[in-house]
C-alpha cells in the first residue's frame, strides 16, 4: 500500500494543514535526497578507472553545491512577493524546496545508470 505523505493531516479545514504538509514534504524530500546522494557517491566510488572515482566524487559534490545554490535563489525568487515573516512565505519556500528536491532525485536517477 502506498503511503500518502499528508493524508493524516489534510482534512480541508484550515490553512495550518497546508503549512504542516509543505513542511513535511520538505523534510521527506530532503531525507530522500540525502539518501540518493549517498547512493551516487557509493556508485562513483566503485568506478574502475584509477583516480577517476575521486575526481567523479569531487565533481558530484561541486555539482550538488551549485544545485543547492540554484534552489536557494530559485525559491527566493518565487517567494519574493510574500511577507518574509508570514506562514505563506514559509509554506511557499518549503513547497518550492520540496519540488526541487524531488526533481533533483529524478534527475540523479537518470544519470550514469545509477541505481
Positions of the model-derived regions?
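N-terminal alpha-helical modules
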Residues: 1-115
Amino acid at each position: 500500500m502506498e503511503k500518502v505523505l499528508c493524508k493524516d493531516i489534510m482534512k480541508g479545514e484550515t490553512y495550518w494543514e497546508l503549512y504542516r504538509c509543505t513542511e513535511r514534504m520538505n523534510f521527506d524530500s530532503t531525507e530522500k535526497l540525502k539518501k540518493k546522494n549517498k547512493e551516487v557517491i557509493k556508485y562513483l566510488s566503485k568506478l574502475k578507472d584509477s583516480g577517476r572515482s575521486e575526481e567523479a566524487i569531487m565533481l558530484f559534490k561541486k555539482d550538488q553545491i551549485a544545485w543547492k545554490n540554484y534552489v536557494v535563489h530559485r525559491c527566493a525568487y518565487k517567494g519574493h512577493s510574500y511577507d518574509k515573516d508570514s506562514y505563506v512565505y514559509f509554506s511557499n519556500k518549503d513547497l518550492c524546496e520540496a519540488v526541487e528536491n524531488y526533481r533533483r532525485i529524478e534527475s540523479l536517477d537518470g544519470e550514469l545508470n545509477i541505481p
